[in-house]
A protein has these predicted regions:
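Conserved core of the PLP fold type I
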Residues: 112-243, 254-255, 261-269, 276, ...
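N-terminal basic, amphipathic alpha-helical segments
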Residues: 1-103, 114, 299-300, 305, ...
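Residue-level detector of conserved, well-ordered beta-strand and adjacent loop positions
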Residues: 50, 84, 194, 267, ...
């Protein structure tokens, strides 16, 4: 059924009784809806449906897949506790699984692993990333739209060549320092946009001359803000207003959500090819696993092949093959589940 904006929802206790489920189940469902911005909780009144624009259903049409076609050095300090934002519990790294997959990759003198690979990244890895993003993050794309590179900084530099260095970039204020450094060093005009409790202020964004807005909707760094659906729609509307406008969605740390299900990606709501989606395995596996990925909208994919398709891949085929099997054989999902428990 459909509920009108402002409609009051039954209490978790009453809903649990009506559905014959435990109250904890209905509480979890309401918490998920709250975190995504579909409902709001008013003190002493209850839960109410939020006013949001009509949602656009983005369907995956199963387009036939085409056939193949700088970080500072870390010093070794003996800290008892690492409070740095890049801190990873390396004691929990799956050494046995990684060692096994490394041996399998090099078995029988596999010479192909040392030949020149696909510039966008190995097709098998891009297929695996596509499948994972679709199931875990609600991202809709083809493997051909995915670029694999050695970290988000490299991919942002590559993106800069596609959009042109005169293109203005709007950044959340505060924002991820490395992204700011990359765009500033490349000469892009920077427009800091302040935030409220729901993320980047779109009215302030509209007053800038930016054509690109860099946002972290599912876990903003460093504030931890989750952008609700209404604000996400406003950002998409801003991007749709003019040709050449795009949103960069940095899906930083989205794997580690400890209450409810992970928030779906903004890219999955986009029906106009306006979102450039970015992610990395450095945070979820280990900082030394310098494998990031970027999903380009179709118009930018054509531009990439024209302007930057000649660049060689920055990730070795050996590492890509290990990572591919790490995901396919279920090690990655098990590792994420374990780390959620450790970090909790």
């Amino acid at each position: 059924g459909r509920l009108r904006a402002g409609s009051r929802l039954p209490s978790t206790r009453i809903l649990a009784g009506n559905l014959h489920v435990s109250r904890s189940t209905t509480q979890l469902a309401y918490e998920q809806l709250l975190s995504e911005g579909y409902i709001e909780a008013l003190p002493c009144r209850g839960y109410f449906v939020c006013q949001i624009e009509e949602l656009v259903e983005v369907k995956y049409h199963g387009v036939p897949e085409e056939k193949e076609e700088k970080q500072e050095e870390n010093e070794n300090y003996n800290y008892k506790v690492d409070f740095s934002p890049r801190g990873i519990d390396l004691d929990s790294f799956p050494f046995n699984a990684w060692r096994k997959l490394s041996k399998n990759t090099l078995v029988d003198d596999n010479k192909d692993m040392f030949a020149v690979g696909n510039a966008q990244g190995e097709y098998s890895l891009r297929q695996v990333i596509r499948d994972y993003l679709h199931s875990a993050r609600g991202v809709h794309c083809r493997p051909e739209q995915i670029l694999v590179g050695a970290g988000s900084e490299y991919l942002l530099m590559l993106l800069s060549q596609l959009i042109g260095r005169s293109t203005g970039i709007a950044l959340e204020n505060p924002t991820y320092k490395q992204a700011f450094r990359v765009f500033e060093s490349l000469g892009h005009p920077i427009f800091p946009v302040s935030m409220d409790e729901w993320g980047m202020k779109v009215k302030e964004l509209e007053k800038t001359q930016a054509r690109i807005a860099y946002v972290m909707p599912s876990h903003q760094y460093p504030t931890g803000i989750v952008i609700p659906i209404k604000r996400r729609q406003e950002l998409l509307k801003w991007a749709k207003k003019q040709e050449g406008r795009y949103l960069i969605e940095d899906d930083y740390d989205s794997e580690f959500r400890y209450k409810g299900r992970p928030i779906p990606a903004l890219q999955g709501m986009d029906d106009s090819q306006k979102v450039i989606y970015m992610g990395t395995f450095s945070r979820s596996i280990a900082p030394a696993i310098r494998v990031g990925f970027m999903v380009l909208p179709e118009p930018l994919l054509a531009l990439y092949r024209e302007k930057a398709g000649f660049y060689a891949s920055t990730v070795s085929r050996v590492d890509q093959n290990i990572l591919t099997h790490f995901i396919i054989e279920g090690y990655y999902e098990r590792h994420l589940n374990r780390m959620r428990s450790v970090y909790r």
